[in-house]
Amino acid sequence: MATEKVFPMTLEGKAKLENELQELKTVKRKEVVERIKIARSFGDLSENSEYDSAKDEQAFVEGRITTIENMIRNAQIIDAAEAHNGLVTLGNTVTFIELPDGEEETYTIVGSAEADPFEGKISNDSPIAKGLLGHKEGEEVTIQTPAGDMNVKIEKITAS
């Protein structure tokens, strides 16, 4: 039997997934069923693009529900404050300066289930996070990214 994949995440990330799951089950699922019912009323389903679209959306919603349920069931809650030992760990917020241009960037390192680059949350599986994990404040690190090496100096590590 295959081992279930573990999804490291913060309590905040788990709560966000639980809210999304609730929304999908109580609102989105009903909306899609209603769209299917309306599309069926148009008659011939063989050339009914509204029906096809609604069925595609239903498949997406049901797939997302299954995915989220699996992530929640296999969640490994990370307490960043507890894990913070002076080194960059999952759940920490890290501020670093790109060398030599001095551009400052700040990211929170989270599990892949809650990564959202638009909110400054990057997956622990991303090249930047992998390059930062295990290092300490003041350290200069070379991070290997698809675009090439990135040299940074870690300025600040905080528990999120």
Curated annotation (Swiss-Prot):
Which keywords accompany this UniProt record? Coiled coil, DNA-binding, Transcription, Transcription regulation
Q: Which cysteines are joined by disulfide bonds?
A: none
Q: Which residues form a coiled coil?
A: 10-37
- InterPro entries found in the cross-reference section: GreA/GreB_C_sf, TF_GreA/GreB_CS, Tscrpt_elong_fac_GreA, Tscrpt_elong_fac_GreA/B, Tscrpt_elong_fac_GreA/B_C, Tscrpt_elong_fac_GreA/B_fam, Tscrpt_elong_fac_GreA/B_N, Tscrpt_elong_fac_GreA/B_N_sf
Which molecular function terms from Gene Ontology are attached? DNA binding; RNA polymerase binding
Xref: SUPFAM superfamilies:
FKBP-like, GreA transcript cleavage protein, N-terminal domain
Keyword Disulfide bond recorded: no
**Transcription among keywords:** yes
Q: What does this protein do?
A: Necessary for efficient RNA polymerase transcription elongation past template-encoded arresting sites. The arresting sites in DNA have the property of trapping a certain fraction of elongating RNA polymerases that pass through, resulting in locked ternary complexes. Cleavage of the nascent transcript by cleavage factors such as GreA or GreB allows the resumption of elongation from the new 3'terminus. GreA releases sequences of 2 to 3 nucleotides.
Give the family, as the similarity comment puts it.
Belongs to the GreA/GreB family.
State what protein this is by name. Answer: Transcription elongation factor GreA
